[in-house]
Amino acid sequence: MNLNKIVNRLFSFLIFNLLITSCEPSKYEITSPVKQQSIQRVDVMPNLPTPFKIIDYNQIAKDYDRLVYDPNQTGPYWPLIWKDSSRKNVDQETYGIYTAMGDARQGITHYKGIFHESLASIGSVLGGSLVGVDKSNQKGENYVGMLRNYFNSETNWNIIMNNTSPEVAQLGGGYARDWWYDVYPNLMFYAVADFYPDEKGYEPILRSVADKFYEADQVLNGNYDYTFFDYEKMEPKKNWICSQQDAAAGHAYVLYAAYQRFKDPRYLEGAKSALEALLNLKENRFYEILMPFGAYVAARLNAEEGTNYDFSNLLDWTFDGDSVCREGWGVLVGNWNGYDISGIIGSTVGFNPVNKNLKDVESEGFGFLMNTYDAMWPLVPMV
């Protein structure tokens, strides 16, 4: 049989099968395609940044973990990790990571080693876990278990906080009560728990955090116009910092994660309540990092729970840089010294380097790399 006959028979066979299958009922539901949402600030970003280079973040994360979690590093400011034997909240040793190289407040020789931040510790455990590092048994150390010391039970707040005790806030650096600092560590802790579902001592902490956030949302009753929340007294508070209404996004994220884990309908109710408080805002209240998590929760609720939330305002507020509270806070767009910097989270307005109270009209703002990485967490799954 020559090649032409083989091709003709194969073609006839394919046509026959297509005709047969076209007569059968479809096994798949035909749905409308997802419409691409337009975000004004994204629309003006270049499709291809200049210069362009793909960064191997997977390898960078592994290298970071190997270097930072090596207590045998030597040299000025090294190692970057130390043990904290204060046994705050939980009767065990924990550990700290320098917030900045050579931070004079930190390390084993300063304040008995108690000054460290969960943003660094929990964040690095989460990052290592994402790239396959078992942080529950790394060279004999259970860094996952050590994170329990950030659960502030001794103060009766009973949530994961940025420090192991409030006295750390008095040691310098401006870490007084700042709502996002009290909420965001709980999002990260829930994410870590997802990688280690059977970690000893995690279950009651996760329950406590969810209960506290649910009760707080009930107290707030749709009004998040406060600087922080006292999770011991269950009272909203105000101080010199502007109101952080986007804390509602953090409550919503944790409560929906808790609902996924425990199937308690109260948590689903609380997630919706907190989200709706955020969606009902009339102006942009993006403060630090929590706003895009509200959009993420809304998208998941629409997809998984049959809701129909319009959360386009939350995405716009994340990007636009017109925050009422923190002026200019959003996503940068532009080219600095030949480098496209579009997509970096930070301030879209600059400040005078001599007098920080004066705006510098010549400046195009400044970026925060860690905030940018944090924003990828809720934004990328929505794309």
What are the residue ranges of the model-derived segments?
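Short sequence/structural elements of tandem HEAT/ARM alpha-solenoid repeats
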Residues: 141-145, 204, 265-273, 308-314
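Well-ordered alpha-helical scaffold segments within catalytic/enzyme domains
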Residues: 121-138, 183-201, 239-242, 249-263, ...
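Extended ligand-binding clefts on enzyme/binding-domain cores
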Residues: 213-228, 232, 281-293, 297-382
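Active-site lining segments of carbohydrate-active enzymes
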Residues: 193-265, 277-280, 296, 321
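C-terminal motif of bacterial Sec signal peptides marking the signal peptidase cleavage site
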Residues: 20-22
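Bacterial N-terminal signal peptides that target proteins for export
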Residues: 2-11
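Solvent-exposed loop and edge beta-strand segments that line ligand/cofactor-binding
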Residues: 91-120, 163-183, 233-247, 278-291, ...
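Low-complexity, Ser/Thr/Pro/Gly-enriched N-terminal "stalk/linker" regions
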Residues: 25-169, 196-227
